[in-house]
Amino acid sequence: MGKRTNVDLGPLPDLIGYVLRRAQLVVFQDFFAAFAPFDLRPAQFSVLTVIERNPGLTQSQVAEALGIKRTNFVGMLDALEKRGLAERRQTAHDKRSYALYLTAEGTALTRKLKPVIRAHESRMVGRISEEGRAALVGLLHEIADGKPRNAAKLKGPKASRSPRAGSAET
């Protein structure tokens, strides 16, 4: 049997989730290559960035702002703290709550990372026009914000009709 070169992906190339995942793989592959010397993953970079821009936020505030589950966030913060990049300080108003700060080493690292993330972003933006980038980011924010739009504006048979009782559609 010969090697098949054309694979029918069916509806996949038209599905937002599929295309987003393919794009994410490209973005993350470049990110991991660029950030390998710093041994940082995207979520860790995000945490350091938010702490740098908002020193003194609590663990819960940073986790919520980034959409990271609390259990995952604690482990990630433990790793950043162990590396000497971030620190927890007990808040004055609530002894059970901890405010987050970068250490001197964390601050120095975030300075080093700025040109790295700019170069990474430039490589990704280089694939599309500036107008396309602005439109893409705007559309992705609409999806991420989770605000439903008017379903009647959608194209396709499912948006224009309602399922009948007993039909296979739900």
Q: In which residue ranges do the predicted regions lie?
A:
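C-terminal regulatory/oligomerization modules of transcriptional regulators
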Residues: 1-8, 130-170
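N-terminal helix-turn-helix DNA-binding core of bacterial DNA-binding proteins
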Residues: 11, 18-21, 25-72, 83, ...
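Membrane-interacting alpha-helical segments
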Residues: 13, 70, 100-102, 156-167
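Charged, amphipathic alpha-helical coiled-coil/dimerization segments
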Residues: 28, 56, 78-141, 145
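Compositionally biased intrinsically disordered low-complexity regions
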Residues: 30-33, 78-81, 164-170
